[in-house]
Curated annotation (Swiss-Prot):
Function as written in the Swiss-Prot or TrEMBL entry: Catalyzes the conversion of pppGpp to ppGpp. Guanosine pentaphosphate (pppGpp) is a cytoplasmic signaling molecule which together with ppGpp controls the 'stringent response', an adaptive process that allows bacteria to respond to amino acid starvation, resulting in the coordinated regulation of numerous cellular activities. In vitro, can hydrolyze pppGp. Also has exopolyphosphatase activity, catalyzing the release of orthophosphate by processive hydrolysis of the phosphoanyhydride bonds of polyphosphate chains (1000 residues).
Catalytic EC class: hydrolase
Regulation: Requires Mg(2+) and a monovalent cation, with NH(4) preferred over K(+). KCl, NaCl and NaF salts inhibit the exopolyphosphatase activity.
Signal peptide: none
Statement: the UniProt record of this protein carries the keyword Cytoplasm: no
Pathway: Purine metabolism; ppGpp biosynthesis; ppGpp from GTP: step 2/2
Protein name: Guanosine-5'-triphosphate,3'-diphosphate pyrophosphatase
Upper lineage: Bacteria, Pseudomonadati, Pseudomonadota, Gammaproteobacteria, Enterobacterales
Gene: gppA
Length: 494
């Protein structure tokens, strides 16, 4: 199928379930075509050393083989696959992801908890009506996301290490549904919540929205029992008493609760009761969408408001007193170079965005010291929270900044996994050249240049006589040409 396809797919490799959403873009909105969900319970396969068992990984791969069949009809640029808490935690996540990528034929991104929370919120903002100021709660298999925001804008983002699968293994391992099991699970959840409760309450909300399987299950129970859709603490306590009355997990029967959801329902319920109690939530409704919808709307660029990446870059520039004019100057030169070689090198739009982001932050190391500025820059970017960027993208930015000047460390460019190694090399070459030609820090001193790519050979053409008139510039370019040749990047300058 050609790249003009209007189909988009989002896959969420969760700790409890794997989900696939396939949609069609229709007049600036989305129409859901397919939703596939499989209980994989990946988190249950983690041992005490945080290694995933072979059985859990095989369950995951088996599910992805089903998804892969549907993905064949969709252009890879219109597919996003993200992995969350369990694969953030697992020491052997790389093994699972390598095979997952092979099965699906597209990249799998392990996203940070904050990025997961942001995407969930975006999904809610795009799909859920009601008041503008909201609190979003998503109880996953191994993490729980809590986000406040107004409109499309988040005001606080938290990803907490508790989920319905991990709490099941920890507090309901004996499969007893006793008062003491619930008490222990709720107490532990409240302790996890306590450090973030004040900030969430400070930002406040007019409406509380739940975006998880636990909340979906509650909705189904309430519908089956003829109740209204509003979830309240009173209803949660009634359901807890009903579960305790059943006595054992395998004997849990509640009207409207499906067998599929029953296993993790008590642990999810305990976490939700703790959230209601700790945050004094009056009532909650089910969200119209969450993580997968956030992914889809992000691909469609149907932003509700501003681009979070741009805001992140602006905040970092201000915080580290980066010369914004110079950052823009380098970005402009880099964008010009990129546009001249993108067809020959088959570069994608996301690569351009990441190159520009690297330009915006390239002088951040100077805030520490001129000596070893590239190393300082790489360290800062690797360790700063950068909302809007995945961990893999952060690593790529850090690697580009590490290699912005001096001899190239090729192995570092190959160790990032945001883009293919060859693309990382190409972006690095463009960044280095842009920095050199913008180094005089004045727009009128940036020469008119053409850059041509022929496979890996770059040919840079400067104005007649420029090299003669700029002896220092000539020396710097000769040195750069030599450094690039050391790593087999041919560069010719005329």
């Amino acid at each position: 199928m050609g790249s003009t396809s209007s189909l988009y797919a989002a896959i969420d490799l969760g700790s409890n379930s794997f989900h696939m959403l396939v949609v069609r873009e229709v007049a600036g909105s989305i129409q859901t075509l397919t939703r596939i969900k499989r209980k994989v319970r990946l988190a249950a396969g983690l041992n005490s050393e945080n290694a995933l068992s072979n059985e859990a990984m095989e369950r995951g791969w088996q599910c992805l083989r089903l998804f892969a069949e549907r993905l064949q009809d969709i252009p890879p640029s219109q597919i996003r696959v993200v992995a969350t808490a369990t694969l953030r935690l697992a020491v052997n996540a790389g093994d699972f992801i390598a095979k997952a990528q092979e099965i699906l034929g597209c990249p799998v991104q392990v996203i940070s908890g904050e990025e997961e929370a942001r995407l969930i919120y975006q999904g809610v903002a795009h799909t859920t009506g009601g008041a503008d100021q909201r609190l979003v709660v998503d109880i996953g298999g191994a993490s729980t996301e809590l986000v406040t925001g107004t409109g499309a804008q988040t005001t606080s983002l938290f990803s907490l290490s508790m989920g319905c699968v991990t709490w099941l293994e920890r507090y309901f391992a004996d499969r007893n549904l006793g008062q003491e099991n619930f008490d222990a699970a709720e107490k532990a959840a409240r302790e996890v919540l306590r450090p973030v409760a004040d900030e969430l309450r400070y930002h406040g909300w007019k409406v509380c929205v739940g975006a998880s399987g636990t909340v979906q299950a509650l909705q189904e129970i309430m519908m089956a029992q003829g109740m209204d859709e509003r979830i309240t603490l009173e209803k949660l306590q009634q359901l807890k008493q009903r579960a305790i009355h059943c006595g054992r997990l395998e004997e849990l029967e509640i009207d409207g609760l499906t067998l599929e959801r029953a296993l993790v329902f008590p642990s999810g319920l305990a976490i939700l009761i703790a959230i209601f109690t700790e945050l004094n939530i009056q009532c909650m409704t089910l969200a119209g969408g969450a993580l997968r919808e956030g992914l889809v709307y992000g691909m469609l660029h149907l932003a509700v408001e501003q681009d979070i990446r741009s805001r992140t870059l602006r905040n970092i520039q201000r915080r580290f007193m980066i010369d914004i004019d110079q950052a823009q100057r380098v970005a402009k030169v880099a964008a010009n170079f990129f546009d001249q070689v993108e067809n020959e090198w088959h570069l994608e739009a996301i690569s351009r965005d990441l190159l520009i982001s690297a330009c915006q932050l390239h002088e951040i190391g100077l805030s520490v010291d001129f000596k070893q500025a590239p190393q300082h820059a790489a360290y800062l970017v690797r360790n700063l929270d950068l909302p809007g960027f995945t961990p893999a993208q952060k690593k790529l930015l850090a690697t580009l900044l590490l290699n912005q000047t001096n001899p190239v460390d090729l192995s570092s460019l190959h160790q990032q996994n945001a883009v293919p190694p060859r693309v990382a090399e190409q972006l690095c070459r463009l960044l280095r050249l842009a920095i050199i030609f913008a180094s005089r820090r004045r727009d009128d001193l940036v020469p008119e240049m053409t850059l041509q790519a022929n496979h890996e050979l770059l040919t840079l053409t400067l104005p007649q006589g420029w090299l003669t008139q700029h002896p220092l510039g000539k020396e710097i370019i000769a040195q750069e040409s030599q450094w690039q040749s050391y790593v087999h990047w041919p560069l010719e300058v005329h």
